[in-house]
Amino acid sequence: MAKQKFERTKPHVNVGTIGHVDHGKTTLTAAITLILSKAGLAQAKGYDEIDKAPEEKARGITINTTHVEYETAKRHYAHVDCPGHADYVKNMITGAAQMDGAILVVSAADGPMPQTREHILLARQVGVPYIVVFLNKADMVDDPELIELVEMEVRDLLNQYEFPGDETPIVVGSALKALECGCGKRECQWCGKIWELMDVVDEYIPTPERDIDKPFLMPVEDVFSITGRGTVATGRVERGKVKVGDEVEIIGLTTESRKTVVTGVEMFRKTLDEAQAGDNIGVLLRGIQKDEVERGQVLAKPGTIKPHTKFEAQVYVLTKEEGGRHTPFFNGYRPQFYFRTTDVTGTIQLPEGVEMVMPGDHVTLRVELITPIAMEEGLKFAIREGGRTVGAGVVSAIIE
């Protein structure tokens, strides 16, 4: 059977369900696909289909995730759901499933639980920009005051982690009742709540800026010198666009960044007017010697990204089974940090009161690199030791 072509008519947004175990994330995911399928906007996926999440490898780490897709009248969504708490931690740190916004599922019968808090914190630290809330299992709560109480608790919790708790939309419903009914009508007591949630997701979570519209950045993978023409840096454009005549900055591995002008852009040995995010290109740089640009640096629009050596990060440490360390590491541990295209040695400082970090842990670390790297919050990296990956991380704050 021929593959269907992906028709890009509506803006695309990545979302996902987060929240405490057994609060109904997977049931809600199933309910969304069922209700939207009644309007021809999705294929209904049963709970079991979503729950038996296939194993994926993201940067050497095994993660179980399910991806479903659906549409509303306004947008096309890719939705990620993870069966286990550890899968969420790994997913959010590796960025295996980037989220433009999250649906936080909280059981109205139980209120916020430890993982509710942890997922909100993770969302804050890895840069999930928007959260909407679905208060689930409302059919199990008879007292409306109880629901109000849980709602207040959730708003408080969001405020604690610098999300706008008072403005956050909260929809009260029951994913299970909507699944059992399945009529899909907006006026239905249960199915209507799923529509209400989708309206909220449509309205409250903005369409993200596309990579192509962001300022130009290209990690340098290789450098050649072409006799009579000058120095060429090659790599894959990470974001933005670049054309002949553009000024770019060479950043990283030294404290001094250099500016230069692009005098040629090539792709597959053909000259190109303009390259954009996703293209593998060679960029000819005016007045730059072959030893003045190297792998591990980036070319970027001047003034948009700076080199740094000290940062705070959220890190997941691989287990022995994932090919990671067999033993814990301690304060002052000095592995390599792999950013984009190169390894840089750095020293780790553990949080106060943490003596050691075990394989399988999720931890906040402070790192000091021996040479600066072009860096911003949200940048992903791998921690390596002798060429093998022992951890995955994301920059959550820049110190200097």
Swiss-Prot record:
Family annotation (PROSITE patterns): G_TR_1, G_TR_2
Subcellular locations according to the entry: Cytoplasm
tr-type G domain segment(s): 10-209
EC number(s) from the headed UniProt entry: 3.6.5.3
G3 as annotated region, ranges: 81-84
Reactions listed under catalytic activity: GTP + H2O = GDP + phosphate + H(+)
Region (G4): 136-139
Recorded GO MF terms: GTP binding; GTPase activity; translation elongation factor activity
Keywords from the named record: Cytoplasm, Elongation factor, GTP-binding, Hydrolase, Magnesium, Metal-binding, Nucleotide-binding, Protein biosynthesis
Gene3D superfamilies reported for this sequence: P-loop containing nucleotide triphosphate hydrolases, Translation factors
Region (G5): 174-176
Assigned GO CC terms: cytosol
Binding sites annotated in the UniProt record for Mg(2+): 26
SUPFAM superfamilies referenced in this protein's UniProt entry, alphabetically: EF-Tu/eEF-1alpha/eIF2-gamma C-terminal domain (SSF50465), P-loop containing nucleoside triphosphate hydrolases (SSF52540), Translation proteins (SSF50447)
Residues involved in GTP binding: 19-26, 81-85, 136-139
General function of this protein: GTP hydrolase that promotes the GTP-dependent binding of aminoacyl-tRNA to the A-site of ribosomes during protein biosynthesis.
Database matches in NCBIfam families: EF-Tu, PRK00049.1, PRK12735.1, PRK12736.1, small_GTP
SUBUNIT field: Monomer.
Stated name of the protein: Elongation factor Tu-B
Origin species: Caldanaerobacter subterraneus subsp. tengcongensis (strain DSM 15242 / JCM 11007 / NBRC 100824 / MB4) (Thermoanaerobacter tengcongensis)
